[in-house]
Swiss-Prot record:
Protein name: Arginine deiminase
A Gene Ontology molecular function term of the record: arginine deiminase activity
Pathway: Amino-acid degradation; L-arginine degradation via ADI pathway; carbamoyl phosphate from L-arginine: step 1/2
Location in or out of the cell: Cytoplasm
The keyword Cytoplasm is assigned to this record: yes
Keyword Hydrolase: yes
GN (gene name): arcA
Length: 406
């Protein structure tokens, strides 16, 4: 088995990709936070300390933690990778030929550590020391961005997702996140950890526009035994699901995809904000959203390059069938109706399973954590008063790269 392999949601987690929030959060303000998909600004130092506690908890569970900034710095050390990233990030069409040329020259001479920080964290015109004869910079305000910050890179789950023996490099729905994918494309192509390794690129690694075929990793659950559960949320489309499923089937990496149509609003922007897999037969569910009658489809390969699409009237039964289980154990969000709604908003259902029956979640979700504990699930709590304001929990903030089967 390749070490670049994710066989489940609940098998032993061995290696994971995180991104510590730093420079990007310093560029997040009340006037731009909504455009950058945040509801509020975060206290930068406190958010970093909370993220350090998350990484430390993972390491205490014998999980190897890779950090996106470090991987990007090491990738930029490869001349071909650096040139490719500069060409994709700083195009003539985006900046005009004169300004693009000046920017590429400036960034090409920059040390890799500084360049990685700017690619992830952004650069304002007031922070740009070079002059250009181009019209564009003369028409911009000092606090406008030359390079937009990517604060949502904190949520490494979404930009790429490893499914069995390969990876999907996801075409993101929102413009504020679309540039993130190129960083992962470069890392998986040129970084020594990934270059030359035996894994499949399912989807998203082509130089093309994917139109409406969007997929985000928060909607993708690798539930094991060749099955994949995908939510069609406000960020993942049926076109994206079918394209990913076709590639999974063509490569022989999955035997079925279960697709659930979710409500299209922010409180359940991804499937993993309302449903996560905690043990072989156990799921956390927010019942106000995850009703049994949600429209569900089973996608399976026909064997001739096409797929069979069949309506399923109960997503829980579809999961039970895929996993060979008689009945799933469902743990709903804790507290009364008000408390459950509040805790779901604060990512009570968005936990990261590190091994069967052991999860990481925010300590603030006391009612739901107590319910998990009573059901036999061990919760390793982490602080999240700042991180949680970004609308993502432990699962959102992690991209498993190596995890055992169930």
């Amino acid at each position: 088995m390749s070490k670049l392999y994710v066989g489940s949601e609940v098998g032993q987690l061995r290696r994971v990709l995180l991104n510590r929030p730093e420079r990007a959060l310093t560029h997040l303000t009340p006037s731009n936070c909504h455009e950058l998909l945040f509801d509020d600004v975060l206290a930068v130092e406190a958010a970093g300390e909370e993220h350090d506690a998350f990484a430390r908890t993972l390491r205490e569970q014998d999980v190897e933690v890779l950090l996106l900034h470090d991987l990007l710095v090491e990738t930029l050390a490869v001349p071909e990778a650096k040139q490719w990233l500069l060409n994709t990030q700083i195009s003539d069409f985006r900046y005009g030929p004169t300004f693009a040329r000046d920017l590429r020259q400036y960034f090409a001479e920059m040390d890799d550590e500084h360049l990685a920080s700017i690619l992830l964290g952004g650069l304002a015109y007031s922070e740009l020391p070079i002059k250009s004869s181009s019209m564009l910079p003369k028409m911009k305000r000092p606090l406008d961005f030359v390079i937009e910050p990517l604060p949502n890179h904190l949520f490494t789950r979404d930009t790429s997702c490893w499914v069995y023996g390969g990876v999907s490099l996801n075409p993101m729905m929102m413009p504020a996140r679309q540039r993130e994918t190129n960083h992962l494309r470069a890392i998986y192509r040129w970084h020594p950890t990934f270059a030359g390794q035996d894994f499949i690129n399912y989807f998203g690694d082509e130089d093309q526009h994917y139109d409406n075929a969007n997929v985000e990793g928060g909607d993708v659950l690798v539930i094991g035994k060749g099955a994949v559960l995908i939510g069609m949320s406000e960020r993942t489309t049926p076109q994206g699901v079918e394209n990913l499923a076709a590639s999974l089937f063509k490569s022989g990496q999955a035997k079925e995809v279960i697709a659930i149509d979710l409500p299209k609003h922010r409180s359940c922007m991804h499937l993993d904000t309302v449903m996560t897999h905690m043990d072989v037969d156990t799921f956390s569910v927010y019942p106000e959203i995850m009703r049994k009658d949600l429209d569900t489809w089973r996608l399976t390969p026909k064997g001739n390059g096409e797929m069979h699409v069949e309506a399923s009237h109960n997503y829980l039964h579809a999961i039970e069938s895929a996993l060979g289980l008689d009945q799933l154990k469902i743990i709903t969000t804790g507290g009364d109706s008000y408390e459950a709604e509040r805790e779901q908003w604060n990512d009570a259902n968005n936990v990261l399973t590190v091994k069967p029956g052991v999860v990481i979640g925010y300590e603030r979700n006391v009612y739901t954590n107590e319910k998990y504990d009573k059901a036999g699930i061990e919760v390793l709590t982490i602080p999240g008063n700042e991180l949680g304001r970004g609308r993502g929990g432990a699962r959102c903030m992690s991209c498993p790269i190596e995890r055992d089967d169930i």
